[in-house]
């Protein structure tokens, strides 16, 4: 069933209403959190149209609101479970209905399988071994995003178009595994990383930019779902009042993102992706 199906939407609204009705807080207090619905929409639109996780929107905002680091990361993961899942399902249906029948994106599922497994291993290696993040990780990741954004704009505007790659070469499999292991670890620390790194690599290697985004979104969704148990069952730090409103907003944003991407040419999508990388980098560097 597609998430835009009226029956599914009715179920979602009903389920959300039940959660509010049984929430251990007064309706008056909960109303104060409705503004986070917009944050969920915004984060999911950028996340699911570029492949970079919504945490790049959520974490800076949560830091400004005085969340603890654990609360910010856990709440970001929880919201992304809504938004990235909506985006992943939307991209999956796009592949099944429009790409697979034409024989396009032959590497779609193989890349997702390998990358998701490696990413989850990297993420749970951090949790299982209790690995602390490098002190300069966030700052370095921000510079990396900024410079890569500039590089992708150069590729899109200056270099002549070349034929797209359809098949994954042995060196690509090696790089995808390494990038995904590292990206999973970074995601454990920052709640973002795997989608951005994977999309960047696939775009640079001249795979279809829409496929790069779709793969990154789906791998990100699988990664955040594997992570949420650490922040709920093991060590609960989710700011649930925020998720109660930002989560449904993120679902809407995740669906809307695909419609936005459909309006962009491959070149414009690359530029949009690069612009978002530079925004991420600039915000991180200025806050570093």
Put a short name on every predicted segment:
Residues 1-40, 63-65, 69-71, 88-184, ...:
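Juxtamembrane transmembrane-helix boundary motif
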Residues 45-55, 205-214, 262-267:
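Membrane-helix interface "capping/anchor" motifs
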Residues 77-87, 113-121, 125, 218-226:
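Membrane-embedded alpha-helical segments of transport systems
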Residues 50-58, 190-199:
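Transmembrane helix boundary and interhelical junction motifs in multipass membrane proteins
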Residues 40-51, 180-191:
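Transmembrane alpha-helix interface/packing and boundary motifs in multi-pass membrane proteins
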Residues 68-78, 101-107, 206-218:
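Membrane-interface alpha-helices at helix entry/exit sites of multi-pass transporters
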Residues 79-81, 217-232, 241-250:
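A small-residue-rich subset of transmembrane alpha-helices
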Residues 58-71, 197-211:
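Interfacial segments of multi-pass membrane proteins
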